[in-house]
Amino acid sequence: MRAVAVSAFGEQPQLMDLPQPEPGPGEVLVRLAAAGLNPVDWKLADGMFGDAVQAAFPLVMGTDGAGEVVAVGPGVRRFTVGDPVFGQFQRPERGGGSYCELAVADENSLAPAARSVTYATSAAVPTAGMTAYNLVEETRIGEGRRVLIVGATGGVGTFATQLAAGRGAEVIATARPAKAELMRTLGAAETVDHTAGPVADQVLAAHPDGVDVLIDMASGPEEFIELTRTVRDGGTAVSLIGSADADVLTEHNLRGFNFVNRPSPQLLDILAGHLDAGRLTVLVGREVPLEEAPEELAASRTGRAQGKTVLAI
């Protein structure tokens, strides 16, 4: 089968011809129609997680995907052959990923795909969508809460903006002027141009009483602490990239933490329901053939990628 893989950590991804995997107990084999590209894909392939990840090579890249079940292993109860599914396929210890024609996944890493959208749309959802949903849950966002989302125009940010607004929160999203109207259509009450000056100063000028929740997907430790000036006494500040210092936040009487995602099939079911109900918009910036994955990964590494990239398989 065709697959985009690396032969060792740090090697360049290449289109390879690899053997078809076979499902074991509790596993399903999926013929993938599309795979979603996430920054974590190239970070894993580059070996950025160190000893925390044990991998077999060649390592097929990719986590997110969508397609049709073509075989099931012993003991599988949730799916049968022919079912449309979406979810997470990255299994580095077995060299498995989603940038390929056929992939094996644990049945509990998948859910029935939404019926009202394409496989390409479904493939763009799992990692970013579950991250955003868990963020909104863990920061207790609800009716009347004011939320500042930094890095709002990315995959997680656009989902978090929609989910928070859908719960009745007042969302302030960072966005360049060219993306401001888009963010408002996704539910942001207002936007802040992070290129026009310190975000904290702009937010406090408009809202001297601050925000209830800060969700930051982009700032380093110093910038993150600066942004916590916007958070009201007793509020919540969360970093997605490990910038939160719990001791410092406690000194400022803030609840805060470095977010760790907890994926589950139940979350995938919820997201599929949102898609079918029209409550979640998925912004696919580019859809390209599988063989162009190396170029798209290079663009993602440099930050040149625009919108969510999906690989058509």
Feature map (PLM): residue ranges:
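Glycine-rich helix-loop-beta junction characteristic of Rossmann-like nucleotide cofactor-binding loops
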Residues: 137-141, 206-208, 229
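Short amphipathic alpha-helix with an adjacent loop that forms part of the alpha/beta core around
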Residues: 198-209
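Mid-domain Rossmann-like dinucleotide-binding core that forms the NAD(H)/NADP(H) cofactor-binding site
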Residues: 123-196
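Glycine-rich beta-strand-centered segment in the early N-terminal region that forms part
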Residues: 19-37, 49-91
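NAD(P)H dinucleotide-binding glycine-rich loop of Rossmann-like/cofactor-binding domains
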Residues: 54, 78, 88-151
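C-terminal hydrophobic helical "lid"/dimerization subdomain
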Residues: 1, 268-313
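Glycine-rich phosphate-binding loop and adjacent beta-alpha segment
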Residues: 218-280, 313
